From Swiss-Prot:
UniProt binding sites for mRNA: 76-81, 108, 126-127, 176-181, 221-225
Protein name, entry field: Eukaryotic translation initiation factor 4E-1
Gene behind the chain: eIF4E
Record PTM: According to the redox status, the Cys-131-Cys-169 disulfide bridge may have a role in regulating protein function by affecting its ability to bind capped mRNA.
Function: Component of the protein complex eIF4F, which is involved in the recognition of the mRNA cap, ATP-dependent unwinding of 5'-terminal secondary structure and recruitment of mRNA to the ribosome. Recognizes and binds the 7-methylguanosine-containing mRNA cap during an early step in the initiation of protein synthesis and facilitates ribosome binding by inducing the unwinding of the mRNAs secondary structures. (Microbial infection) Not involved in the plum pox virus (PPV) strain D infection process.
One of the protein's GO biological processes: regulation of translation
Length: 233
């Protein structure tokens, strides 16, 4: 509850700062897609020291970035995932907002970009041991309309708002030509009760009224785009 309140407070403070200082960042000063203003070493390690006023999260989380340019050079299926790179790991509410407020949101990312937020030491790949037996829930949104849903998904995960939060590996937003998709990856696909609980709670967090489906990673690897939903809510 303390962390959840801190997340809400930080969000309110951020909005207030925006309203009192509406001058936009100069174009030349904007970070590149996926770029974080800060030390590159922090991409692979959670912060060691937590200031007394900081609010520690239950888990450390890492943002990962997969750019269209990097993916275009990968033509073989076995190369899938090799272009994904970590950009920052955070362990507190304050670190999260510091990062989130200094990176481009989904609506500002190039078409073809995949942007991930996964628990520390879990890679956003089917081959990762923690993800291997899992699956994913996916919501589809109109082009340029995923920013709020992406933020609420992040806050729901890092704020431990899911009853089966231990099942969650992370989330990814996929920016495409005509639409954007957000997916939550989970660990144990055959745990139907846990997956259905996550799907229902996620829809509630997003106030999303369309039906969403859950696909096993194993089926996605075998059948790719023709993989069928195993669960729906």
């Amino acid at each position: 509850m303390v962390v959840e309140d801190a997340l809400k407070t930080s969000a309110s403070e951020d909005q207030a700062k925006t309203e009192t200082n509406p001058k936009p960042r100069e174009e030349d000063d904007e970070p590149e897609e996926g770029e974080i203003v800060g030390d590159e070493e922090s991409a692979s390690k959670p912060s060691k020291g937590i200031a007394p006023e900081s609010h520690a999260l239950e888990h450390s989380w890492t943002f990962w970035f997969d750019s269209p340019a990097a993916k275009s050079a990968k033509t073989k299926q076995e190369d899938w995932g090799s272009s994904i790179r970590p950009i920052y790991t955070f362990s507190t509410v304050e670190e999260f907002w510091s990062i989130y407020n200094n990176i481009r949101h989904p609506s500002k990312l190039a078409i073809g970009t995949d942007f991930h937020c996964f628990k520390y030491k879990i890679e956003p790949k089917w081959e990762d041991p923690v993800c291997a037996n899992g699956g994913k829930w996916t919501v589809t949104l109109p082009k340029g309309k995923s920013d709020t849903s992406w933020l609420y998904t992040l806050l729901g995960m890092i704020g431990e708002q899911f009853d089966h939060g231990d099942e969650i590996c992370g989330a990814v937003v996929n920016v495409r030509n005509r639409q954007e998709k957000i997916s939550i990856w989970t660990k144990n696909a055959i745990n139907e009760a846990a997956q259905l609980s996550i799907g229902k709670q996620w829809k509630g967090l997003l106030d999303y009224n369309e039906t969403i489906g859950f696909i096993f990673h194993e089926d996605a690897m075998r059948h790719e785009r023709s993989a069928k939903n195993k669960y729906v809510v």
